[in-house]
Regions:
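FIC/Doc superfamily catalytic core
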Residues: 1-192
């Protein structure tokens, strides 16, 4: 079945993202390492959406909006740098650093932003820190900061932006004592 006016490749991309999220949520006890990120990209680019999905790119790539070009990815270097990032104690900082490292590294032929966002969210969810989600109205700002990050390799500004604007989760508020007692009374009624 197709959707009128939507390209098949777009439908495949959305379906692949769904499967990538399923994979990420099923793997919450696994380390965020090179192998994991390759598997995420394989999910993102599966069904022939991305050539060589899940494998390091072996050709140069260009980035839209900048003349900066990422170097060729080297597996041993990536493994070492990811292990260093994995040592960051604060899970939110670790997640944002991992996401930004991966998006700038451009390990794959395509799907690097989706893959890096999923890897960052994997760390966030595993640490109980919510999720990273760039609101649609902030996407132009995010893309501008991303280009500056590509060119400078300084993640300070974009990390602060993500931290302040792009982390969602449940906010637990402290209930006043009367409301808490009332809630306990309601629960006792169900025990009968």
């Amino acid at each position: 079945m197709s959707v009128q006016g939507v390209k098949v490749s777009d439908i495949v991309a959305v379906n692949n993202l769904k499967h990538a999220w399923q994979f990420v949520l099923d793997m919450l006890d696994e380390p965020t390492d090179y192998s994991f990120v390759c598997k995420v990209n394989r999910c993102v680019g599966g069904n022939s959406l991305i050539n060589r999905a899940g494998y390091l790119r072996n050709v140069p790539v260009r980035m839209v909006g900048t003349t900066w070009k990422p170097g060729m990815p080297i597996e041993s270097q990536i493994k070492e740098e990811m292990a260093e990032i994995g040592q960051i104690e604060n899970p939110t900082d670790r997640a944002l650093t991992m996401m930004l490292y991966l998006v700038r590294k451009q390990m794959f032929l395509d799907g690097n932003k989706r893959t890096s966002m999923l890897a960052g969210n994997y760390v966030m969810i595993g640490g109980g820190c919510g999720i990273i989600s760039v609101p649609i109205e902030l996407q132009p700002v995010f893309m501008g900061l991303l280009i500056r990050f590509y060119e400078s390799n300084d993640m300070t500004e974009i990390k602060q932006f993500l931290y302040e604007n792009c982390i969602d989760g449940i906010e637990f508020t402290h209930l006043p004592e009367q409301e808490a007692e009332h809630g306990q009374e309601n629960l006792r009624g169900w025990e009968r």
